[in-house]
Amino acid sequence: MRKALKKFLKNSKCLLSIITILLYWYLRFVYFTSRQKFIFYDNRNKEKFLNEQGVIFAFWHNMLALSPAMFTGHRNVYALISPHLDGKILNALVGKFGCQVIVGSTNKNSIVALRNIIGKLSQGANIIVTPDGPKGPVYKVNSGITEIAYRYNKKLIPIVSSTSRCFRLKSWDKLIIPIPFGTIKIIVGSPLALVADKVKNHLNLEKQLKSLTESLKK
């Protein structure tokens, strides 16, 4: 039954469009009624954050619904989104918030997606990725994004977010759905110190994201 419903949604462009519009206006209302609190590491501030160019930002998959709040004001931003059903909805949704899309994944040897990422970074665009997506496990980095950052000498910055008012979906990542009139907390970490060791870079990104996630509770 669940598979049949997913197949129906995937093939129903009209229904997907309606869902996207409803989600967009709901999130707009949430962001309008919520207070935002940014915390910056590494001597950064909001102005520097908004003016970053050619940077990769990484955050956990369950924070996707908070990502428009994270990147409001950024220009020339591309989100790496999977071709799955939830990706199709996100594809349309992020576009309404001014973010462009690269369809694919860095853990599936998607040559087209990798070329697009590298090309956009070289043009000064910023890329946002969820390194534990698209299917988990939650809070476990399974993406090759650290290899791209090291090879092309690009900054890789971890970023996390939470909200004081939310509910969670019964998905693999317990997706956070913000509720109006809360406080959205966003922590922008320091760029990772990347080395020639792929495994160390991979584990370092995971460690930093987990550490920042714990900091959200303080």
From Swiss-Prot:
Membrane topology of the entry: Multi-pass membrane protein
Similarity comment: family membership: To H.pylori HP0270.
Subcellular location: Cell membrane
Cellular component annotations (GO), alphabetically ordered: plasma membrane
Name the UniProt record assigns to this protein: Uncharacterized protein RP090
InterPro entries: DUF374
Main localization category: membrane
Alphabetized CDD domains for the sequence: LPLAT_DUF374-like
Coiled-coil residues: none
Transmembrane segments: 14-34, 175-195
Keyword annotations of the record: Cell membrane, Membrane, Transmembrane, Transmembrane helix
Matching Pfam families: DUF374 (PF04028)
UniProt superkingdom: Bacteria
